[in-house]
């Protein structure tokens, strides 16, 4: 798939912009704080209805405006598909082929994206919430039912936590009813994640082996606070663990176990990657991004759109070359950079844009 054009109204520092893209490589050039990253963020937001930079919607809407609007035309094997998202203080309104979508899970997945940004380098050593977000974004794009199960799980979790906070005399019978519901949806969430991590590991290990000249093997472990022996017993194990934690949850007034607390661990040659070198960690992240592209292609039968936000400056020449070599010519790629000097072997069928003070100019490469 590829994004033919995007129309932007009141997004970040853009009042209005309309940009048509190459189906291959698109490079946004400009000094810092001119709006390069905002373009990639707009594409990301059009695909996923959320930003990768902030959880505060009001930061996305241009100063002194009340709403934003993004329109895009996506080319898929099945034909052209218009997408639209409106954001205001009333929430999100999404449309596919001009038809309003009842749920975000009905919208997400029509345009798939893989983002590689400098903050992704924190995926190995950062907080568990970053790794859960990584799973949610990738898995949500290729398996809409996951988003539905996750949404239902979070809804019951919110109910359970609210009840624990609301009283000092907890009704164990009522708490057990909530436990049953939480275990139902939570088991589904964990099962989806385990299947996804197994597929991701297979893809990422192959890429990491190539990057390390066949020296290193990559393993990914899903770390749950629920003792999981096999996928058939997840619900019962979750329910048992919730019951065992009743005293703790009542005392702390929150839910201490479940997929909302789970984590990922990465291992290079059986060593925890958080103790690895910076070079090893960068190769690991690069392997994950390559694996994301391959996995989305395998599941959806279409390549995702690749967003590279100022990451070339974070990679040495070897990793730059491996990244560029790994990008199939069918993968539409968007890249931001302050200069083309450090980039070599760029394909001829690219478009280059100059970004200055929230205005985008198409330019010819010398």
From Swiss-Prot:
Gene Ontology MF annotations: ATP binding; single-stranded DNA binding
UniProt GO BP: DNA replication; DNA synthesis involved in DNA repair; double-strand break repair; SOS response
Entry keywords, A to Z: ATP-binding, Cytoplasm, DNA damage, DNA repair, DNA replication, DNA-binding, Nucleotide-binding, SOS response
UniProt key word Cytoplasm: yes
Protein location: Cytoplasm
Gene Ontology cellular-component terms listed: cytoplasm
Chain positions recorded as ATP binding sites: 30-37
Signal peptide: none
InterPro entries cross-referenced by the UniProt entry: DNA-binding_RecF, DNA-binding_RecF_CS, P-loop_NTPase, RecF/RecN/SMC_N, RecF_2
Function according to Swiss-Prot or TrEMBL: The RecF protein is involved in DNA metabolism; it is required for DNA replication and normal SOS inducibility. RecF binds preferentially to single-stranded, linear DNA. It also seems to bind ATP.
Family: Belongs to the RecF family.
The protein's name in its UniProt record: DNA replication and repair protein RecF
Organism of origin: Streptococcus thermophilus (strain ATCC BAA-491 / LMD-9)
